[in-house]
C-alpha cells in the first residue's frame, strides 16, 4: 500500500514540476510548424480566423493607436462569420499572412474555460489525479491557462443554450479576472501565437485529446480559482450555468 502511494505521489510530484517548469520556446512557427498546428486545430473542429500580431515596441499590428489588446484580437470585425475550418482557406491565410496570429471562435463547436495560470495548473493536476477526462489545454505566457471543452449549446438550437454568470466576451474580459467561460460571441488565441515581449501561447495538452463536457471540469476549476483568490468556493451560486 505504501509503495503504491509512494509511486502515485512521485508521479504527481513529477507532473507538478513539469507543469511549473518553463517549456522551451516554440520555434516551429518559423519552420513550417505553424501551418501544421493551425491545420490540426481546424481538423479538430476549431473554427479559425486571422488575428493581429506583435509589432515593435510592444505595439500591435493593427492601426489603432494605443490598442488595448495588442496581438490578441481578430483582424476583421466579421470574425464570427469569417472563422472556418476549411483547410484550403486556412492554408491561404497562413501563407499570405505569415506573421498573423489566429483566433478560434468559441460557442459553435467548443468553449474555453480560461483561468489564472497558477490556479489553472493546480486544477489540471487535480483533474488528472482524479482520472477526469481533460481535453486540449493551452498556456498563455501572460498568465492564463485555457481548457478547451465541448460547447454548452449550438447557435442553431436556442433550446440547448443557457446563460452562465462566468460567460465572458471580448469587451468584458476585465470584469472576469478569475475563471472566464468563453462561449458564443467570444474567442481565444489558438497556438501557436505570439504576444508582445517575446511571449506566446502554446499547447500543454494537444489536440489529440477529445473535448470534454465543461461541467465535468467546472467544480474543480471553480474550487481552485477560489482557493487562489482567497475565497470560499460557492458551487451552488455564481459561476454555475443557470437554465431559464
Model feature map: region roles:
Residues 2-142, 152, 207-218, 222-244:
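Signature for HUH/AEP ssDNA processing cores
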Residues 147:
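Catalytic core of tubulin tyrosine ligase-like
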Residues 151-244:
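DNA replication initiation modules
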Amino acid at each position: 500500500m505504501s509503495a503504491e502511494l509512494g509511486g502515485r505521489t512521485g508521479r504527481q510530484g513529477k507532473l507538478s514540476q513539469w507543469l511549473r517548469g518553463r517549456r522551451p520556446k516554440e520555434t516551429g512557427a518559423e519552420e513550417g510548424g505553424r501551418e501544421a498546428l493551425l491545420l490540426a486545430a481546424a481538423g479538430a473542429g476549431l473554427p479559425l480566423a486571422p488575428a493581429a500580431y506583435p509589432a515593435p515596441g510592444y505595439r500591435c499590428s493593427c492601426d489603432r493607436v494605443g490598442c488595448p489588446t495588442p496581438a490578441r484580437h481578430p483582424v476583421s470585425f466579421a470574425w464570427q462569420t469569417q472563422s472556418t475550418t476549411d483547410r484550403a482557406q486556412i492554408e491561404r491565410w497562413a501563407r499570405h499572412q505569415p506573421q498573423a496570429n489566429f483566433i478560434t471562435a468559441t460557442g459553435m463547436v467548443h468553449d474555453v474555460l480560461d483561468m489564472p495560470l497558477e490556479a489553472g495548473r493546480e486544477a489540471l493536476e487535480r483533474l488528472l489525479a482524479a482520472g477526469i477526462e481533460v481535453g486540449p489545454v493551452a498556456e498563455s505566457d501572460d498568465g492564463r491557462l485555457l481548457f478547451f471543452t465541448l460547447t454548452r449549446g449550438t447557435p442553431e438550437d436556442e433550446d440547448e443554450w443557457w446563460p452562465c454568470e462566468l460567460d465572458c466576451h471580448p469587451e468584458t474580459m476585465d470584469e472576469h479576472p478569475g475563471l472566464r467561460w468563453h462561449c458564443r460571441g467570444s474567442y481565444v488565441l489558438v497556438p501557436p501565437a505570439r504576444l508582445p515581449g517575446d511571449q506566446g501561447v502554446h499547447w500543454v495538452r494537444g489536440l489529440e485529446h477529445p473535448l470534454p463536457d465543461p461541467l465535468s471540469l467546472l467544480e474543480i476549476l471553480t474550487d481552485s480559482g477560489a482557493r487562489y483568490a482567497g475565497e470560499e468556493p460557492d458551487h451552488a451560486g455564481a459561476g454555475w450555468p443557470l437554465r431559464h
